């Protein structure tokens, strides 16, 4: 890429890169050429992605602003922040080595994407589900090797999330594939499901019995990382102290408004909220009321 090249080719290249490395996100964007795959969250791969994203930042910097519209210039800055935020997550926040829930979310979302959206015949989607289930033991083994000293709350939430994935595989997937009449494929799915569930159960037991008792990690990001996420992901450069002051001011103003409205209703905030609860439609009429 050279200075002055239009922005569009870079955007296309960047999207292709994201789709190749994040097949689940690709599926939710309607790109299904990677649907047979699960993400590879191994240390080697993710550290390599950090370097590759750094190269993309440099490529984008070489796209000259001259000839760009104002909108394109803004988009260029947004793209830069987006890529830098991904690098920041990989290299600074490093949730991929701290949070076992991340791996369960990859698997759950990837499987759900094939169930929820009938973009292809059920047989085709079932074969892609089969492929993902066969890759599940590898994903779980990667989690076992990669996660280091996770905070206790991350362990508890990870176990809960992984148990939810097991429930999905054992109960929701069969219901979603009731129209599938390929007995050979159904048999393969049953076998792959059993192997996937066995791997997940083994990992949750490992987390519960070996990792949790020794967990000393902190869930806190720290001020520097918190400010970095705000700037790169939200475009907010005010800093934590300033944001806290704004939040406290807004809280006080909101509380005062609550008290004022409650007073006009002839009571305190608690009694006003109780009156609102009594005016709530029943479960049977909730949808029709909203309509």
Residue ranges and their predicted role:
Residues 1-291:
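N-terminal maturation segment of proteins
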